[in-house]
Each structure stands twice: as structure tokens, then as C-alpha cells.
């Protein structure tokens, strides 16, 4: 199996981004959703992106943002990839001049394969836990057996991942990448350096 990529989401501080980069992370996530405790200002985001070394992907996370809001961020910030975590249609996700991934919240009865086909131009599909009224970052996991094999898009697995369970998750789902936020935090928005390093090490050793 190819090496599984890792993304640390909800980065709010330059020092946390650098710890992740030095540990070998593939991508960091910046949350542009004001209701999130991990939301960043444009000023914070600029400082974080400017500090990233080459080959670390900067991902911007949006939840039901308008096209103007997304465009306003992109005018100021060199994001590599967009992540849409709300009720966005394929049309909402496209036309920004950046590749995108679409988050789907998984629950029993969800036809994940069909949803993947809806977002046929997505670079990948992120699978997260379904919690009513909460678009993501819940710290809750979901039943990994609900993820079908052979999906038509690269799968980024999220939802309640941590050092304790990420190896098992990778063995069960065989994702393209894993995405963690709360599982490597000291408090919301502040990463724990040792947890970040340990998580990335577990992914590499899976």
C-alpha cells in the first residue's frame, strides 16, 4: 500500500505549523469558519502560510461561505487546496481556480459512492462523523465499516482520530490520507507538539 498522507487541521499558530512540518506532515488546514473555535483571521493565516516550508500543502477550510468570501481569501492568501465542509453543491466548490476536496458526514444509509460521483471534479472526498448541526471538528469517530472499498475518489479519513486509533483506522479503511484536529490538541486551537509528532509517526508506521 502507498504511504498514507497526513493533514493537521485547525492550525492557528505559526509554531504549531512548524512542529507539524518538521514532523513530516503533508498538509495543514486553516479554518475560515467564524463559528469554529479554531478559526483564523486573515492575518494569522498569512503568517502561517508564509512560514511553511516547500511541499507542505496549505488547505483552506470553508463552511457554506459565499463565492465572494472564498474569493476574498484567495485574493490575499496563496492557498494550495480548498476544503468545503458544509452543504456546498458541486457548483459552489468549483470555479475558484484551486483544486478542492469535499467533506461528507457519514451516517448509516448514506450512499457514499453516489455522493462521490456528485463531486466528480473533486480532488478527494473527506469522510467525517455525522453530528447534527455541527459541520466538523467534533472529535467524534464513525463506524469505519460504512466506508465502501473502491470509491472513485481518494479518501481522506477524519473524525475522532488520535494516536491511539489511527493505525487501526488506516488498516480498516485504507485511506489516501488521514486528517486530525482535536486528537492532537492541548486545547481547542492549540496543538500539543508531542501528540502531533506521535500522530504523524503512527501514520508513517501504519
From Swiss-Prot:
Q: Which GO terms describe its molecular function?
A: phosphoribosylanthranilate isomerase activity
| Record's keyword terms, sorted | Amino-acid biosynthesis, Aromatic amino acid biosynthesis, Isomerase, Tryptophan biosynthesis
Pathway info: Amino-acid biosynthesis; L-tryptophan biosynthesis; L-tryptophan from chorismate: step 3/5
Q: Which Pfam families match?
A: PRAI (PF00697)
Positions the record marks as coiled coil are: none
What reaction(s) does this enzyme catalyze? N-(5-phospho-beta-D-ribosyl)anthranilate = 1-(2-carboxyphenylamino)-1-deoxy-D-ribulose 5-phosphate
Please give the biological process terms from Gene Ontology that the record holds: L-tryptophan biosynthetic process
Q: Which InterPro entries match?
A: Aldolase_TIM, PRAI_dom, RibuloseP-bd_barrel, TrpF_fam
Q: What is its EC number?
A: 5.3.1.24
Member of which family? Answer: Belongs to the TrpF family.
Protein name as it appears in the record: N-(5'-phosphoribosyl)anthranilate isomerase
Per the UniProt record, the source organism is: Azotobacter vinelandii (strain DJ / ATCC BAA-1303)
- Recall the taxonomic lineage recorded for the source organism: Bacteria, Pseudomonadati, Pseudomonadota, Gammaproteobacteria, Pseudomonadales
